[in-house]
Each structure stands twice: as structure tokens, then as C-alpha cells.
UniProtKB/Swiss-Prot annotation:
The lineage of its organism: Bacteria, Pseudomonadati, Pseudomonadota, Alphaproteobacteria, Hyphomicrobiales. This is ATP-dependent Clp protease ATP-binding subunit ClpX. ATP binds at residues 121-128. One of its GO terms (cellular component) is HslUV protease complex. Component of the ClpX-ClpP complex. Forms a hexameric ring that, in the presence of ATP, binds to fourteen ClpP subunits assembled into a disk-like structure with a central cavity, resembling the structure of eukaryotic proteasomes. InterPro entries: AAA+_ATPase, ATP-dep_Clp_protease_ClpX, ATPase_AAA_core, Clp_ATPase_C, Clp_protease_ATP-bd_su_ClpX, ClpX_bact, P-loop_NTPase, Znf_CppX_C4. Keywords: ATP-binding, Chaperone, Metal-binding, Nucleotide-binding, Zinc. The gene is clpX. Belongs to the ClpX chaperone family.
């Protein structure tokens, strides 16, 4: 029979969680087994792990290959809008599964992979789409930051480190790693720094693009299991990158002006009406993206050629940001409501408050990424005061609170005095 301890007792008899090492005084509950103890926090963590496992199994169809609709349905639960980008990713991941299944059959037709480029303004959900994909697929998946990469032999991360991380995600199972998916973020930051490549060696721009070419196309990479620079004597693992799907993403600041300039040249005549880039939303401009625009931006032709599928994401308007605040399973409002619920307080946002928060994010041009910092600033004083206040049962946030012209409204629970009179 397990015993539950609520703390108390002298220090000699203090019990500790066998998993995290916290004492019974640091946690709310400590559950005793025959020889071990586990605290309520570790139980919560175990439940989260099991929930994640259940999510992964949800997207498998009976044949073992999730359909594009199944993948998109899960993406819809977490990512608002960006329908076109989600369709592209869903089809790409589905085809990746099918190609892997096809590899095991003897066939004279070789299925080539189609790497993907995601283009969209900052804060529109490129990275979040990749993070959500990582949770729902059952092949090794890693995210790499292009800004940390340098050409081999220079200070920084080698391109081979990407394959090493994938190998680690596959628990050093080479077969599984060779069937994985790699997301390279901030790929726009490795654009060529100058139109004249002979001026100076561009080790973090064009040099990285050149280094990425082979592993994206398909090559056998020699990967040091412990990192090559610190352990030069170790044996190398051979990883074939032919079947690894690469997804690249970037904000490509300034690309909209390159696209618009091309459009202005082609739209000449008495009936031509051309909106300037300032009059159009960036996402609208990105829909007209052509490979030649990426070349002018600074990507080399060979690199653009390795990314045959281009998906553009739209910038988020006020309505979309309000949806992001409230609708996804792990929406920001739900997260803060859960935090307040731990203090037994209900957090309520008025509709005008949500729109005011969304408007601020649009003004800052930070997209969904800026929502959390705005929420933190609004709720900071409340979160500071709340643990020491007694009787608060509800906190109400209105549009005036977001604008800074009012304080959050605290609603207290009714209390009875000794004579039975009720007071707020």
C-alpha cells in the first residue's frame, strides 16, 4: 500500500524523491512505494511523456504511412492559418514515408526526394511548423540553425554536425538516421555576402551553401560520434544522406523588394497598375516568388536547385493573431490560465483585450513571436502580487489594461465573518 506524505517532521526523517532528489518539504505530495519515493512533479512529467507518445501514435494509418490529411489535421490543432504551407509539408512528409517504404522493394524506378524551402516573414510560424512536425512523426527529426554553421576548417559548427545530431536523435542507429528529416532554420542568413565572390572567402555564407550541397543531394558522410575536433582518433560512422529529407526555412528580409522590382519591370503599359511593396502585405508579395529572386538575394544556383519545392507563408493579421492566442491546444492564453489556475485563480481576457494584444504585435512587426513578451508585460505585476494576496478568485484583463490606462480587475471570493455576515 503506498503512503502519501505532506511534509513535516524533523530533518533526520526527511524523505526524498528517488527520481529528482527533492525533499518532501519542496513538493506537494511524496508517494511511497516498497523501496522508492516519487513526488507529484515527477508523476506529472511521466504523464506528459506518455501523452507525447500517444500523439505520435495518432498520426499512423493502418498501413503505417500517415496520409497528408492525417498529418495536416494534427498540424491544424497547433498551427493557425498557413493552409498552403501545411499542405506542402503534409504531402512532403507523406511522400517521404512512401519513398522509404518503396526503398525496401525491388524496383527499377528510383524515387528522388524533393527538399523543401519555407519562405515567410518573421513570426509567421515556420519554425513552429517544424517543431510540431517533430512531435507527430516517428522518424528521427532534428532542427539546425544555419547561422552557427561555417565552412569546414573554420571556427564554428561543420555541416557534418547536422548529421551527427540526426544520428544522436536516432540513438546512433545509422539505419534510422538515414530515414530522418532535417529542418535548417535561418537559411537566409547564409546568403552570399557579396555579388563578387572573389573579394574574400565567405566562410559563413556561400561557403556553407557549398558545404550543404552534397549532404542535401545525397552522399555518404563520415560522422565522428563524439565530434571530430576534440576526438580526432575515433572511428567514423558512415551515414548515407540520400534518403534524408531536408526542409529549409528563412524570413528572407528584403526579398519582397526584389520580387516587387521584377514585377514592376514586367508590368509596363497604359493599363498596368502596380502596387508598391509598401501597399501590399509581405505574404502577398512572396506568393509571386520565383527561383531567380532567390539567386538575386544571394543563394547560389546549385543550392536553389536542391530545393525544388518552395512554400510561402503569409504574414499574420490581427484576426489570425487573436486565433493564435486562443484556439490551438497549447494557445498562449490557455498557458497563462493554467499558471493562474495553480494559484486557484481564474484568468479572464475580454475580446477587446485580445485584439489590443494582437494589434501591438502587428505594430511591432514581430508576428506571433511577439505575443508572449506582450502578455508577460501585461501580467507581470499581477503574477508578482498574486501569491501574497488572499481571497482572489478571478483576474479580468480588459483592453484598457493592455493599453496601460487601467490595472487588472481583481475579483475576491465572498467571505463570512463570525456573525455570519457576507463580505466581498
Amino acid at each position: 500500500m503506498s503512503k502519501v506524505s505532506n511534509g513535516g517532521g524533523d530533518s533526520k526523517n526527511t524523505l526524498y524523491c528517488s527520481f529528482c532528489g527533492k525533499s518532501q518539504h519542496e513538493v506537494r505530495k511524496l508517494i511511497a512505494g516498497p523501496t522508492v519515493f516519487i513526488c507529484d512533479e515527477c508523476v506529472e512529467l511521466c504523464m506528459d511523456i506518455i501523452r507525447e507518445e500517444n500523439k505520435s501514435s495518432m498520426v499512423k494509418s493502418r498501413e503505417g504511412v500517415p496520409t497528408p490529411q492525417e498529418i495536416m489535421a494534427v498540424l491544424d490543432d497547433y498551427v493557425i492559418g498557413q493552409k498552403d504551407a501545411k499542405r506542402v509539408l503534409s504531402v512532403a512528409v507523406h511522400n517521404h514515408y512512401k519513398r522509404l517504404a518503396h526503398q525496401s522493394k525491388n524496383s527499377d524506378i528510383e524515387l528522388a526526394k524533393s527538399n523543401i524551402l519555407l519562405v515567410g516573414p518573421t513570426g509567421c510560424g515556420k519554425t513552429y511548423l517544424a517543431q510540431t512536425l517533430a512531435r507527430i512523426i516517428d522518424v528521427p527529426f532534428i532542427m539546425a540553425d544555419a547561422t552557427t554553421l561555417t565552412q569546414a576548417g573554420y571556427v564554428g559548427e561543420d555541416v557534418e554536425n547536422i548529421i551527427l545530431k540526426l544520428l544522436q536523435a536516432a540513438d546512433y542507429n545509422v539505419e534510422r538516421a538515414q530515414r530522418g528529416i532535417v529542418y535548417i532554420d535561418e537559411v537566409d542568413k547564409i546568403s552570399r555576402k557579396s555579388d563578387n565572390p572573389s573579394i574574400t572567402r565567405d566562410v559563413s555564407g556561400e561557403g556553407v551553401q557549398q558545404a550543404l550541397l552534397k549532404i542535401m543531394e545525397g552522399t555518404v558522410a563520415s560522422v565522428p560520434p563524439q565530434g571530430g575536433r576534440k576526438h580526432p582518433q575515433q572511428e567514423f560512422l558512415q551515414v548515407d544522406t540520400t534518403n534524408i529529407l531536408f526542409i529549409c526555412g528563412g524570413a528572407f528580409a528584403g526579398l519582397d523588394r526584389i520580387i516587387s522590382a521584377r514585377g514592376e519591370k514586367t508590368s509596363i503599359g497604359f493599363g498596368a497598375t502596380v502596387k508598391s511593396v509598401d501597399e501590399r502585405r509581405i505574404g502577398e508579395v512572396f506568393k509571386e516568388l520565383e527561383p531567380e529572386d532567390l539567386l538575386k538575394f544571394g543563394l547560389i544556383p546549385e543550392f536553389v536547385g536542391r530545393l525544388p519545392v518552395i512554400a510561402t507563408l503569409e504574414d499574420l493579421d490581427v484576426d489570425a493573431l487573436v486565433q493564435i492566442l486562443t484556439e490551438p491546444k497549447n494557445a498562449l492564453v490557455k498557458q497563462y490560465q493554467r499558471l493562474f489556475d495553480m494559484e486557484n485563480v481564474e484568468l479572464v481576457f475580454h475580446d477587446d483585450a485580445l485584439r489590443a494584444i494582437a494589434n501591438k504585435a502587428v505594430e511591432r512587426k514581430t508576428g506571433a513571436r511577439g505575443l508572449r513578451s506582450i502578455m508577460e508585460k501585461i501580467l507581470l505585476d499581477t503574477m508578482f502580487e498574486l501569491p501574497t494576496l488572499e481571497g482572489v478568485r478571478e483576474v479580468v484583463i480588459s483592453g484598457d489594461v493592455v493599453d496601460g490606462s487601467a490595472r487588472p480587475l481583481y475579483i475576491y471570493a465572498e467571505r463570512q465573518d463570525e456573525k455570519g455576515n457576507v463580505s466581498a
